[in-house]
């Protein structure tokens, strides 16, 4: 338990750091640790002179109070370590304020916040910047055990789309999921459907950064989707009697969820990250949605759009990793696909595709044949094309599309598994 709370770096003195490392190693090997065994360990590692040899170890053992209060002592060490980190970070922030160099003020604020947030996050989790392979293997094995015990189920955040969740095992922490489509294909709708299900099912917080639509517009979409209410009637207010009970039900469900909407336009990566960190600190953040990537801006970098998109893409992946949550980033597609016979999107259709393709863990495209062919036999159907999946399979998932409800739904299957 103490090993979960402390690391050797939490000790100020070098000799105490070494003693804690030695105790940790002996403990992991289920070997006893006292002045004699520790002295032998330091002798075998040629480190005895750095800790004062056996005499100092004996002195420590004799002057140490009872082990009954060991956790309280460990918490004191941890608290002092946090205070030293704050002093160090505070000094760095002050130095940056005096000599900012070429960095803009928003960037300095973001860096300062990140440094303080890292200390707070490490204080909660006890996690350090660097872990040994042994520690990483232990975490991997524990995760494998969980996956083994939940075989056939979703290990990440569920989206509510059965076939998609089966292929991806849900939205995984630290993954950047890029969802791209031509206008009117339903990319905002699909992202909101995933967000609403994740929030209602997992009870985690979901934050949607909407740089295209207002918060009230998204709220109406969510009400339409949850309540199965015609979006057109919601827009005009011409509701039927049965619609009101559905509106009430949908609003009750949504008001009890932890969905947050930020509709500030043209967010910078630094500002978006700052807002997401705040939600992470105050709530159990489970998912971030960005609508959409090309509407973000990087201050002072407007001359080269490709470079700007590259920086935005990298920042979103870094955010997913830092916050340990999946990030769904919506993206535009080039108009070029409209001139092709087969208008199903491919990787090269991503606008400023190079960096996005590289940074994304999953790339999804939406294709609805009825949009291009009015006599299509696939009316009401949508293809969600998993074009890239860094840690799993690619393929196509078919969903029902209900435009009037701003909603996608699972396709029903018959007894032999084919789609009805």
Regions flagged by a language model, labelled:
Residues 1-82:
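Noncatalytic partner-interaction/assembly domains of nucleic-acid and motor enzyme complexes
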Residues 54-114, 118-125:
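Extended, charged alpha-helical coiled-coil/arm scaffolds that mediate oligomerization and mechanical coupling
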Residues 118-175:
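Pre-Walker A segment
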Residues 166, 189, 197-284, 298, ...:
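Cytosolic-facing regulatory segments adjacent to core modules
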Residues 183:
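The conserved Walker
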Residues 186:
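Conserved glycine(s) of the Walker
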Residues 273-285, 314-324, 335-420:
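C-terminal regions of RecA-like/P-loop NTPase motor modules
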Residues 285-330:
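Helical hairpin unit composed of two closely spaced alpha helices linked by a short loop
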């Amino acid at each position: 338990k103490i090993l979960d709370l402390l690391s050797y770096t939490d000790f100020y003195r070098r000799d105490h750091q070494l003693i804690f490392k030695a105790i940790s190693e002996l403990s992991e090997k289920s070997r006893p640790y006292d002045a004699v065994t520790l002295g032998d360990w330091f002798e075998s590692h040629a480190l005895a002179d750095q800790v004062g040899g056996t005499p100092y170890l004996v002195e420590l053992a004799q002057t140490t109070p009872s082990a009954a209060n060991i956790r309280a002592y460990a918490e004191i060490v941890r608290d002092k370590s946090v205070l030293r980190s704050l002093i160090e970070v505070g000094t760095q922030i002050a130095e940056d304020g005096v000599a900012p160099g070429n960095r803009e003020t928003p960037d300095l604020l973001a860096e300062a916040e990140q440094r303080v947030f890292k200390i707070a996050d490490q204080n909660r989790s006890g996690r350090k910047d660097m872990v040994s392979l042994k520690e990483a293997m232990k975490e991997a094995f524990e995760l494998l055990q969980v996956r083994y015990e939940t075989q056939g189920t979703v290990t990440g955040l569920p989206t509510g789309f059965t076939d998609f969740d089966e292929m991806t095992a849900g939205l995984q922490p630290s993954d950047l999921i890029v969802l791209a489509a031509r206008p009117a294909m339903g990319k905002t709708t699909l992202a909101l459907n995933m967000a609403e299900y994740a929030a209602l099912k997992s009870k985690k917080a979901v934050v949607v950064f909407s740089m295209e639509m207002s918060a009230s517009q998204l709220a109406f979409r969510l009400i339409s989707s949850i309540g199965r209410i015609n979006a057109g009637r919601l827009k005009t207010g011409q509701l039927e009697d049965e619609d009101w009970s559905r509106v009430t039900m949908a609003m009750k469900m949504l008001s009890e969820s932890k969905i947050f909407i930020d509709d500030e336009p043209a967010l910078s990566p630094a500002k978006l990250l700052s807002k997401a960190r705040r939600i992470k600190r105050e709530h159990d953040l489970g998912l971030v949605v960005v609508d959409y990537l090309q509407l973000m801006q990087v201050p002072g970098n407007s001359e080269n759009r490709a470079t700007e998109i590259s920086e935005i893409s990298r920042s979103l992946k870094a955010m997913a990793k830092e916050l340990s949550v999946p990030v769904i980033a919506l993206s535009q597609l080039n108009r070029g696909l409209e001139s092709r016979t087969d208008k199903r999107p491919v990787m090269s259709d991503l606008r400023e595709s190079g960096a996005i393709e590289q940074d994304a863990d999953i790339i999804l495209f939406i294709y609805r044949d009825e949009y291009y062919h009015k006599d299509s036999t696939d009316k009401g159907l949508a293809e969600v094309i998993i074009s890239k999946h860094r840690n799993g399979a690619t393929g196509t998932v078919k969903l029902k599309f209900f435009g009037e409800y701003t909603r996608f739904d699972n396709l029903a299957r018959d007894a032999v598994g084919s789609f009805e």
